[in-house]
Amino acid sequence: MSADSESMIESAPISFTDAAAAKVKELRDDEGNPNLKLRVYITGGGCAGFSYGFTFDETVNEDDTSVEKEGVILLVDAMSIQYLDGSVVDYEKGLMGSRFVVSNPNAATTCGCGSSFSV
């Protein structure tokens, strides 16, 4: 990797862990579609005001922020990136099950389950 690509990755407004990238690869392989990308978005709702959402998408929209890691692409729309700036997407396995989670430095409060937040 060149120094230019490393600095682009370090300055990305959102990032994701190796565990998240590995899980996306696994799910993408299960679907048999190498064009699937993980889209992270924000919606109104949840017990704290905003909720995180995750879906697979084949389309990269013009205003999307796109980050690549280990051949996996993470997409965030223009509205959501303002709330997710500096966040890290991870994949966790625990007693409550397995799920993608967001560590968001912009969240003033989060709910107990971690799926909603307020700013």
UniProtKB/Swiss-Prot annotation:
GO BP field: iron-sulfur cluster assembly
Q: Which cofactor does it need?
A: iron-sulfur cluster
Q: How is the cofactor bound?
A: Binds 1 iron-sulfur cluster per subunit.
Give one GO molecular function term.
4 iron, 4 sulfur cluster binding
InterPro entries per the record? FeS_biogenesis, FeS_cluster_insertion, FeS_cluster_insertion_CS, FeS_cluster_insertion_RrpA, HesB-like_dom_sf
The alphabetical list of record keywords is: Iron, Iron-sulfur, Metal-binding
Which HAMAP family does the entry link to?
Fe_S_insert_ErpA
Tell me what this protein is called: Iron-sulfur cluster insertion protein ErpA
What organism is the protein native to? Alcanivorax borkumensis (strain ATCC 700651 / DSM 11573 / NCIMB 13689 / SK2)
Taxonomic placement: Bacteria, Pseudomonadati, Pseudomonadota, Gammaproteobacteria, Oceanospirillales
